[in-house]
Amino acid sequence: MLEIGSLVDGKYKILNKIGQGGMSVVYLAMNERANKQWAIKEVRKDGVQNFEVVKQGLIVETDLLKKLDHPNLPSIIDVIDGDGSFLIVMDYIEGRHLESVIREYGAQDQADVIEWAKQLCDVLSYLHSRKPPIIYRDMKPSNVMLRQMESHAY
């Protein structure tokens, strides 16, 4: 697990933990030279069975994602193959997961929901139009970010 305050790859300072999934932890990091925040997803060897197989899949996936260019998809900035972990540096999307918004506030305004659905359909259409098509198999409210002060779904 990355330490808060530690420096990764000589340039990314870990600020805090912002999320956790089944096999990964996501941190907010700062590239102090560029004065820019990034999200760093850490997949640890000790938290995954068949880590080498998972790592190879992540390498293929991140190589594919680096080539994507859509306003509602975070960009992959860097991949760091560390000793015992695999790190993916990506755009930090400031906002909340759709899941937490629904849990806290319940049903949402119809106009907002329609706008979010349009944006999600646009992203999925973009992914499906790639050659070969990209099929996103993990669509769920906890994987959709809603930006603050805007009605953009990521």
Regions found by a protein language model. Give the residues of each.
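Protein kinase glycine-rich loop
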Residues: 15-21, 26
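Conserved N-lobe loop of protein kinases adjacent to the ATP-binding glycine-rich P-loop
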Residues: 30-38
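Activation-segment/catalytic-loop signature of the eukaryotic protein kinase fold
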Residues: 79
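Conserved short submotifs of the Hanks-type protein kinase catalytic core
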Residues: 83-97, 101
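Activation segment signature within eukaryotic-like protein kinase domains
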Residues: 116-117
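Protein kinase catalytic-loop region centered on the HRD/HxD motif
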Residues: 122-134
